[in-house]
């Protein structure tokens, strides 16, 4: 994913930073960077959530562009924090926002059984405050699940105004899971409050494969052009006002 983004930058004038928990994946990523001539990429190995390595003077580094395809609904994402946790009223160990020294979860703590918004909040904390933008691949549940996730989603839309677009993807697009996913696009310092919704999961917007569906180059180009145009397209795209989203309880 980082290499794909790297190749989209004219002249390759970009610095690459990344972190992955699995040691084998880290080794493959590092080798892949080297084989593609990216010798100065800084790829760290470790838990991105409980032990982020992108630090400067004990603060999270910030970036103009952040992209990720984190594991869907990661269970026990908070396990790296719990050594410092206290028992709650029911005698259970529970993650709390104050356990994170980087204040990434001040908007709300995602449920232990679903780490999707933990990654979103981490990525947002690493965004440049002036012109940062990010895209993250997530399961559809992030769009409607309630409780703490609903509170976080509302803060992101109502108070921070950082959600720029939601791109629905076809089912069976990724290895290891057949569930449909979406891409959430976030931007800092947005001048509007509406959100663009693109439904790229419909018939004709992808190629059906025997074992896996595929987004063809023409399908990807259609998504990109629609995102930049930011206009409604019949049965494909819709620009929802903040009031509409609010009336739908931020789902």
Model-derived features with residue positions:
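A conserved structural/catalytic subdomain of Rossmann-like adenosyl-cofactor enzymes
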Residues: 57-251
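S-adenosyl-L-methionine
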Residues: 27-60
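Conserved SAM-binding motif I beta-strand of class I
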Residues: 15-20
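Short acidic capping loops at alpha-helix termini that bridge into adjacent secondary structure
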Residues: 12-14, 40-42, 194
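Short alpha-helix immediately C-terminal to the canonical SAM-binding loop
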Residues: 2, 24-28
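Conserved SAM-binding loop of SAM-dependent methyltransferases across substrates and taxa
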Residues: 1-11
């Amino acid at each position: 994913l980082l290499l794909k983004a790297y190749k989209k930058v004219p002249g390759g004038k970009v610095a690459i930073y990344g972190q992955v928990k699995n040691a084998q994946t880290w080794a493959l990523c590092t080798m892949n960077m080297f084989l593609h001539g990216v010798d100065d990429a800084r790829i760290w190995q470790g838990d991105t959530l409980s032990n982020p390595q992108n630090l400067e003077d004990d603060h999270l580094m910030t970036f103009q562009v952040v992209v990720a395809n984190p594991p869907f609904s990661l269970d026990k994402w908070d396990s790296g924090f719990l050594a410092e946790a206290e028992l709650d009223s029911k005698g259970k160990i529970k993650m709390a926002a104050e356990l994170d020294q980087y204040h990434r979860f001040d908007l709300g703590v995602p449920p232990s059984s679903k780490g999707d918004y933990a990654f979103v909040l981490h990525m947002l904390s690493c965004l440049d405050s002036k012109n940062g933008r990010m895209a993250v691949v997530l399961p559809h549940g992030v769009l409607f699940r309630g409780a703490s996730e609903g509170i976080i989603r509302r803060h992101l839309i109502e108070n921070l105004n950082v959600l720029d677009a939601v791109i629905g993807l076809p089912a069976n697009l990724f290895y290891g899971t057949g569930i449909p996913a979406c891409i959430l696009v976030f931007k800092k310092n947005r001048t509007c409050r509406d959100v663009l919704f693109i439904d790229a999961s419909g018939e004709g917007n992808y190629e059906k494969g025997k074992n896996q569906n595929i987004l063809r180059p023409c399908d990807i180009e259609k998504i990109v052009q629609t995102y930049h145009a930011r206009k409604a397209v019949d049965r494909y795209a819709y620009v929802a006002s903040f009031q509409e989203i609010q009336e739908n309880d931020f789902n």
